[in-house]
Amino acid sequence: MDRLRIVGGRRLEGAVTISGAKNAALPQIAAALLSPYPLELTNLPDVTDVENMLGVVRLHGAEVTRSAHAATIDTSAAVSKETSYDTVRKMRATVLVLAPLLARFGHARVSLPGGCAIGARPVDMHVAALAALGAKIAIENGLIVASAPNGLTGTRIVLSSPSVGATETAMMAATTAKGETEILNAAREPEVADLAACLNAMGARIEGAGTHRILIAGDTGWHAARHDIIPDRIEAGTYAIAAAITGGQLELTHARLEHMASVVQLLEATGVSVWPGDRGLIVSRERPLKAADLTTEPYPGFPTDLQAQFMALMCCAEGASLLRETIFENRFMHVPELMRLGANIKLQGTMALVRGGEKLHGAQVMATDLRASVSLVLAALVSEGETIINRVYHLDRGYEQLDRKLRLCGADIERLSA
C-alpha cells in the first residue's frame, strides 16, 4: 500500500494543470448507457474512481476505448446486468447507472452503494425520483430493484433538498420518458449543468440545468456524440489552498473563476490574492493569514468537498475560525490526524473550532477519505520535519498525479511503495 513522504517548509511556485472534473465525469460515463451510439468523453481525469466507473459500464457490455485523458464508450451491445456489491463497494457514484439502465432496458438491479465513509448519504431521493416517473422500486437483499416494463412517464419532481445525485438520476431517467419532466429544487452545481450539456450533445433536450428548475423534453432521439468535461473546481480549490498555505504563488491552468466564486471570496477574506490570468487563475499570498469562518452549503455556496482543505489552512492562520458542516454528517474524520501534526481543533457536533497559529510538526498520519487525505497533504507542506501519510489510495480516487504536480511546483514529496 503506497504512502506519501513530505518534508514541509517549501514555498510552492509555478503552474498546475487542472484536470477534468471527476464529479462531472462519473455521471457522464453512466449516461453513456442511455444510448446505443458511441459517446466520446475528453478531458477525462486519470483517477481510480473514473477507472472503476468505466469498469462498471464494461460489466454491462460496453466497449471502452481508452486514450490519454479520453474514452470512447460504445454501448450498442450493452445489457442490464446485476451490479453487485463487490463492484460498487469502492465508490458511491456507481448508483448513477441505475437510471440509465432502467430508462433504456426497463429494468435494473444495482447494489446499494459504498464509497467514502463520511455519513449515510442515502439514496432515498434517487429512488423517489424514479418512482415519480413511474418506476416500481424495491430493496431486496441489499439491491435496488427497479422496473418500468411500459417505460417512464414525464412528470413534475420536487426534490426535498437539492441533491446532486438525485438531480442527475432524475435528469437521466427523464430523457427517455414519455412527455416533459420538470425538476424543482434541483441542484445547481456546475457538474449537473455539464451532465446536461453532455446529454444534449447525445440528443436530449434539457433546459435550465444550473438553476433550481430543469425541464427535460423526453422521448430523446439519441446519436453519437463527443463532450469535453469541465475542469475540476475542487482540484483547483485544493491547489489554491496549497499556494495559500505555503505563502507561494500558483497559476491554475484551466480553472474557471465562475465556478469558484465562493472559494475565491473566502480565500480573499484570509489575505490571499486571486486574479484571472491568460490560462486560468493565479493565486498568491504574501501577507499573514487571517482567520475566517466557514459554512458549507450547496452550490453556489462553499463546497463541502473543500472543507477539510480549508481547515488545514486555518490551522496556520492567526486567531480562531469556526467551521460549520451542513451537507454531510461525520465529515470531520481528518481532525484527529491534523491534531497529530499539532493542530488545535475542538469539535462540537457539526462545528469545528480551529485555533490557528500553532506550529505544525511532521508525524505519521492516516488518510480516512478522499478530501481528508488531501488536507493532511496540505498541512504536511508547512509542517516542520517529515510527515508520512498512509492509505494514499484515497487520494488517487480523485486527484490525478497529486504528488507529481506538487513536486513540479517545489514541494519535497515522494511516493513510497510498500
UniProtKB/Swiss-Prot annotation:
Catalytic activities: phosphoenolpyruvate + UDP-N-acetyl-alpha-D-glucosamine = UDP-N-acetyl-3-O-(1-carboxyvinyl)-alpha-D-glucosamine + phosphate
Modification sites for 2-(S-cysteinyl)pyruvic acid O-phosphothioketal: C116
Residues annotated as catalytic: C116
Protein name: UDP-N-acetylglucosamine 1-carboxyvinyltransferase 2
Similarity comment: Belongs to the EPSP synthase family. MurA subfamily.
Keywords: Cell cycle, Cell division, Cell shape, Cell wall biogenesis/degradation, Cytoplasm, Peptidoglycan synthesis, Pyruvate, Transferase
GO BP: cell division; cell wall organization; peptidoglycan biosynthetic process; regulation of cell shape; UDP-N-acetylgalactosamine biosynthetic process
Matching NCBIfam families: murA (TIGR01072), PRK09369.1 (NF006873)
Residues at which UDP-N-acetyl-alpha-D-glucosamine binds: R92, D305, I327
Location of this chain's protein in the cell: Cytoplasm
GO MF term list: UDP-N-acetylglucosamine 1-carboxyvinyltransferase activity
Keyword check for Ribosomal protein: no
Cited function: Cell wall formation. Adds enolpyruvyl to UDP-N-acetylglucosamine.
HAMAP family hit by this protein: MurA (MF_00111)
Class of enzymatic activity (EC top level): transferase
Binding site for phosphoenolpyruvate: K22, N23
